[in-house]
Amino acid sequence: IITDVEMEERVKLHRQSRPEYWRTYEAGTLLTPSIGEEENYLLDCITTYISNIMFEMTENMDYIGYEMQGKIENRVYSELASLIKEINEKDYNLNLVTNELGNSIVPSNHLARVFRDIQGRINQKIAALSDEVYLVACGIPVKIK
């Protein structure tokens, strides 16, 4: 979700950095309709996807109760698990990009804590479904699964 000029510029630069031969699908909050006949897919990124779902599902960003947090997390996981299942059924390849947010201090504001917690649990669940998992630190991929 593009919310300001800086984000619009960031997205534009990101699009320009992609090789011309890449076919790009910008899915927003609906992932599985993006699957076509290509054999290789890159979802970049789960963190942005979670943000999009949170903004779509939540009216009051000042406080997100535990029930709504669960609904957000369940929807994100359901969509990602469906995508992974469809990719596996077609014997395609899927690379997922996410951010590891749990290596820092606990955020001081409610929204950041909720987001970090949902992100962490989704990362764990997706890693469990994945054949391989890499943590990229300082541009160096480290295989952790």
Whereabouts are the PLM-identified features?
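Short amphipathic alpha-helices and their capping/turn segments at secondary-structure boundaries
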Residues: 25-41, 79-91
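Short N-terminal secondary-structure initiator segments
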Residues: 1-9, 42, 133-137
